[in-house]
Structures are given as structure tokens and as C-alpha cells.
């Protein structure tokens, strides 16, 4: 009798699963991105141009994670591919966007602007926020007006604006492109201790990147990055401390893109820091997220001085989501998988639009 009852229960459970699978709501999710393989550098072009773009390995990791949500995932590709598909009448319930764009200071705004134009929901921040955060000077002004500490700075569009007598920043300073990410244009030579070095580096940056140079007081100390996801309320993930050559007090050293390739960089999460500093970093990240109008995900970079004061450096609303970056570390620190973090970002956007779906 027991065997018959068990058999009935198994059959009932199988039928239940089949009915549930048939009835549950699945969304059609588009996936926009910039792949390194889609762009061929012309002779003389710097690898910097595609430094922010993703490898096929990273794209596959994200795509797999999105598929674990149970929704239907369709690769779209870059902004040009998106335009073609939209012109052909293609539509999606929502687009998961990590596209960086290829040209101009509004490049990160291109995909969000197109999707808004065609009334297609998408993950991440809108075009206005993308533009504001790509311009480091604008982002610093916004957070500063919200009471958040950020190093004093100058933005120089033309070398004639640099005047030794009127130069009020304290040395050392760091000179970097105002409208770039992935540490483009930043090297140890970016640190300057005198005006002539500032002038030389500023001239080089303006000529190479065809954009303003940001000259900023350099905070001697340690370096952190903090990821934030979701919206109501935002979920601030554990701070990640950056160690270079096994040192957490970096002095005048700092994160550079070259560190990734020479294996000198190490991410420490959870960071081995006082609770008071952990709290400051989380609160400052939360407040920056709100002040800049970030949605669904963002990452914030800080320098921390000898008195444990965190200084906002920049915000990346399109942080690298691959396994080589900080997201696997922070997901492990809060007891969830990398795939679950990606799905949290997706579900955050879905809920923000009030889309009808089944939360798997």
C-alpha cells in the first residue's frame, strides 16, 4: 500500500512541476554589451580604446548567470547591433545592459538613450547618470554637494588654464583623464610633486585623449572599492581592500590597470579594517549611490587617509561583472553565489519597472 501511495505522490509531483513550468511567466531578456572581439584596432591605435570591453569568457559567465533566472536570454551585442535589431522591429521585455560605448563622452549613455526612445525597459542607470559619472569632475561636484568628501581638484581643458601662481592644490597631486574608466591614462608617472611635472603630464593627457585633464590632490593611504546593487533599499556589499605587492597601506602607490596583468594586485574581502571604517565606507557608498542617481548596480572607488577618512574618487555605473573582478568575492562574503548576484541585479531592474514575472 505504501509503495502505491509513494508512486501516486511522485506522479502528482511530476504533474505539478509540468503544470508550474507551463504556466509560469518567463520574460524575454536582451543582453547588450561591447565585446573585445567585435572591434579591430587600426594601426597606431592604443589598446586603451577597447580596455573596458569584455572578453567572450566574461560574457559567457554573465549569460550563464542570467539564464539561471529561468528567463529567456538573447544576445544583442553593441549599440550598432541594437539599432539594427530595433529597426527590424525586435523588442524585449527588458534589456540587461553592460555596453560601454566606443566614442565620445556620452558613449555610456548611448544604449540607455536608445532603449528609452523606444520605450524598452533596461537594467542599470539612465543616460543622464551615465554621462554624469563618466565625467569625473561632474561626479565629484555632485557628491561634494551632498556632503561627501572628495579630494580637491582642477579640471583643465587647455594648457593655458594652468597658472603656477594660481595653482592652489597641495602636492602630491595625480593627473588623469577626466572622462575615462578602467584606469586609462593613469600610471605611476601620473603622480606629481611639482608644477613642471603637472604641466608636462597635463599636456600629454590632453593631446593623447583629446579631453580635459583632472588634477586632484592625491590621498596618501589605502584604497578600497565598494559595490552596491538593488534599489529599495540599495544593498551595500562588503568593502574590498586593494593590496599591491601584498601591502594594504599603499602610500603613493595606487590601483593601475597594469597591476591586473602583472599579478601585483590582490583584492581582500572582507577587508581587515576597523568596524568604524567599514561603516564609513558603506555609508559613503550608499549616499553616493543616491546622490548620483545610480540604479540596480554601481561600484565606488575610495582612498582612505591616515585618519580613516574615505575620499570619493569615482563611481562606475557599469562595473566589470566578470569572475576576474570583485563580484565573486563580495558574493562569497555575504553567503550567496556569483550567479545569484547577477540575478539580483536583473530582478532589481525587473521590479523597478513593475514587470509581471515569476521570481525563480
Predicted regions and their residues:
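Polybasic, lysine-rich low-complexity intrinsically disordered segments
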Residues: 2-4
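ATP-binding N-terminal substructure of ATP-dependent carboxylate-amine bond-forming enzymes
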Residues: 7-8, 13, 19-122, 128, ...
